[in-house]
Each structure stands twice: as C-alpha cells, then as structure tokens.
Swiss-Prot record:
Record function comment: Transfers the gamma-phosphate of ATP to the 4'-position of a tetraacyldisaccharide 1-phosphate intermediate (termed DS-1-P) to form tetraacyldisaccharide 1,4'-bis-phosphate (lipid IVA).
GO cellular component, one term: plasma membrane
Any Pfam family the entry gives: LpxK
Binding residue positions for ATP: 51-58
One of the GO biological process terms: lipopolysaccharide core region biosynthetic process
Single annotated GO MF: ATP binding
Keywords: ATP-binding, Kinase, Lipid A biosynthesis, Lipid biosynthesis, Lipid metabolism, Nucleotide-binding, Transferase
EC numbers for this chain: 2.7.1.130
Catalytic activity: a lipid A disaccharide + ATP = a lipid IVA + ADP + H(+)
Family: Belongs to the LpxK family.
Protein name: Tetraacyldisaccharide 4'-kinase
Length: 331
C-alpha cells in the first residue's frame, strides 16, 4: 500500500482511525514487553525504524555488512521476507527465488551477503549461526523481541520524521516514539532534517546513545543519466525521494510513476512506461529495490539506480561497529 496523505498531515481520517491505532499500539507494547528472546553466540545488529514505510533501512543494513566485511567478519542478513510466501528459515537464492517467494529486500541483500528469510527470527538466527555466520544483520525487527539484539539501529527519515504522530492505521507509527527510542543503541537520521529531529530525538535516548546524521547518494552508475531525459518509476516507501534524487543528480525527469511499496509489477504495468519512454526519447529508470520485482523479460530494458548511505561523521559509525558489534566476537 501507499502511505495515505493523512499519515503526514493530520486530518479527519486520522482522528477517525485513532481508536484502532491505540489498539495496535497496545498490542505492540505487549509484544515488546515479552522476556528477552534467544541469544546467539554471535553479535546481532538490528536495523529498524519506528514507522511503516521507507526510511532508508536497506542502505544502512548494507553499510553495516560492508563494515563487518572490512573487519574480516562473515556476516549474514536475516529478514522476515515481507511480501514473500516462504516462511523459512530458507537461504535466499537470487537466481532461483523471486519476490513472490522471499520478498524484494532479501533478494537485494542476497547480492551482497548470504541472506536468510524466516518468519521466526530466532529460528532464522540459529540457522544462520549454524551455517557459519559470525554476525547477523537483521533487516527490520525493532519491535520483534524473539531474537536478542546486541545493537539496535533506529533509522529515521529526516524529511518525514514520525508523520502525524499517530499509530497505524491512523498514522505511520508502529509504537510510541519514547518507547522505541529508549531501546535504540543508535539513531541514524537520514536526509534533510526538516522536522527538527536532531533536537527532538536526543531527550528520549539513553545516556551515551549517539545520533548519527547521514544522507543517501546514488551509486556511480547514476552518472550516465546526467543531462538525459528519464521516465522514472518506483514502488518504495516514498517514491518522491527517488524522483528528487534523480533531479538533484542532473537527470531531466520528464515523467514519474509512483507505485505502492513492494508493488508486484506485471508486464502490463511496465510496458506502458517503456512505450512512454521510447516516445519521449527518454530512459526508463527505477530503483535497485524495484528492479528485483520487474518481469524478467523487461528487466534489461530498464536502467537501475542504486543508493548508498553516506555518514556525515563516518568515524562515529565505524566506532559504533567496533564497540557494539565486534566486542562480542571471540578473540
């Protein structure tokens, strides 16, 4: 689904749904309050957020894995596999599996490191450890206590913040801001801070918990689009962020097509976009997360732009990995 407008700007619909949201929040509060879950013999870092929709979790998870790799640590990803039908635990095969099997994010992550899909996070973590993982990076799961975490990174979109401050479905919040931030080992604020979050977040953090600022930048492959006309489409949490990124790098976005997050593309969805791009003399462009959901025959006809997270203080991020992740590794 696409996030409704009232999730960001409060209105009558949000107030009408508030009672349902309070029930959702109570259920989450009850789940999070369960006793600590299974503790692995290896470090577990969770990359999560407090809201539904895209905040930049996947690029951060990839950055964590890259930091582990540079330290000689064998890391495995662990995902619930949202949108896929397989319950797992199962190792993601980028060639043999499709998004209908394991979801889109695991397919993207599996191109970087071994990735496991498991509805039961504890079972997935145990299988990863048994398969040789020296650390586990969880994609999402901040509100899931079944697997004990050594570090919880809470990712926040600086341009969206916490929306209207209400709970799903009245707003985007999965749980209360105070409770979610209290469990954070660090907060990563991504993008322009239009919500004054750098001042609003720290009072809710435990002493010594850092707030890191970062931005998303397109990969080097985006350079070929500078000055060219593009027809852009995306089915992510906030498609407009992708369109703005293309404009900022110098591409001429002549048409844009937003789809719902995790949208399962069919050939009938993509062909009109390809035809439009051809008619305009433009390049059809989408995100790397969308690319894994494209019909195989049409995938080669679409240009793909990935993004990476760039920290404003990279040494602070590196220190976080050293202190909170590698400290649990056997010497």
């Amino acid at each position: 689904m696409r996030a409704p407008e009232f999730w960001h700007k409060d209105g009558f619909a949000a107030r009408l749904l508030e009672p349902v949201g309070l029930v959702y929040a109570a259920l989450t509060r009850h789940r999070v309050a369960r006793p600590p879950g299974v503790r692995l013999g290896i470090p577990v870092v969770c990359v999560g957020n407090l809201t539904a929709g895209g905040a930049g979790k996947t690029p951060v998870a990839l950055a964590v894995m890259d930091a582990l790799r540079r330290r000689g640590v064998v890391g495995h990803f662990l995902s619930r596999g949202y949108g896929g039908k397989m319950e797992g635990p199962v190792a993601v095969d980028p060639v043999g599996h499709g998004p209908e099997d394991v979801g889109d994010e695991p397919l993207l992550l599996a191109n970087s490191a071994p990735c496991w899909v498991s509805r039961n996070r504890a079972s997935g973590g145990l299988v990863a450890e048994g398969a040789g993982a020296q650390a586990v990076v969880m994609d999402d799961g901040h509100q899931n206590p079944s697997l004990a975490k050594d570090l919880s990174l809470v990712v926040v979109d600086g341009g969206y913040g916490f929306g209207n401050g209400r709970y799903i479905p009245a707003g985007p919040l999965r749980e209360s801001i105070e409770a979610g931030l209290a469990r954070a080992g660090a907060v990563i604020l991504i993008g322009s801070d239009s919500e004054n979050l750098a001042a609003r977040i720290p009072p809710h953090l435990k002493a010594g918990v850092p707030l890191l600022t970062a931005r998303l930048e397109p990969g080097p492959e985006a350079a070929r689009l500078v000055g060219r006309k593009v027809v852009a489409f995306a089915g992510i949490g906030r498609p407009e962020k992708f369109f703005a990124t293309l404009t900022a790098l110098g591409a001429r976005v002549v048409a844009r097509h937003p789809f719902a997050d995790h949208y399962p593309y069919a050939e009938a969805d993509i062909q009109p976009i390809l035809d439009e791009a051809y008619g305009l003399g433009a390049v059809p462009v989408t995100t790397s997360k969308d690319a894994v959901r494209l019909p195989p025959d049409q995938r080669p006809q679409v240009d793909v732009v990935g993004v990476r997270v760039v920290f404003d203080e990279p040494l602070a991020f590196e220190a976080l990995i050293d202190r909170l992740i590698l400290g649990r590794l056997p010497s």
